[in-house]
């Protein structure tokens, strides 16, 4: 337990500092909303429509796929660096992970989740 004391202190200090910064920003920041400040900003143009419009579900699917494959890359880099030390067990564990991701990708492809009709 004592070996995690530094991590606990760091976590508590970070939490206290973040809370202090947020609290001070509410105290010292001017709170004067006007129509220009609370309106949606669209690259200098007047807003064409409500900023909270509906999105097509395919955008969310693409975002989720991006997150999944981005996480795959974050797992692959440390695995590639330590491949010599982790041996066959680490190799086959990552191969199983990649096979599961590939099966999921093929399933989504066959279901038409990547089609933009």
Curated annotation (Swiss-Prot):
Task: Kindly list the GO molecular function terms attached to this UniProt entry.
Answer: NADH dehydrogenase (ubiquinone) activity
* Single GO cellular component term: NADH dehydrogenase complex
List the coiled-coil residues: none
Read off the InterPro entries from this record. Answer: NAD(P)H_OxRDtase_bac/plastid (IPR023043), NADH_UbQ/plastoQ_OxRdtase_su3 (IPR000440), NDAH_ubi_oxred_su3_sf (IPR038430)
Q: How does it sit in the membrane?
A: Multi-pass membrane protein
Q: Where in the cell is it found?
A: Mitochondrion membrane
EC assignment: 7.1.1.2
Protein's job: Core subunit of the mitochondrial membrane respiratory chain NADH dehydrogenase (Complex I) that is believed to belong to the minimal assembly required for catalysis. Complex I functions in the transfer of electrons from NADH to the respiratory chain. The immediate electron acceptor for the enzyme is believed to be ubiquinone.
What family does the Swiss-Prot or TrEMBL record give for this protein?
Belongs to the complex I subunit 3 family.
The protein here is known as NADH-ubiquinone oxidoreductase chain 3
The protein's organism comes out as Tetraselmis subcordiformis (Marine green alga)
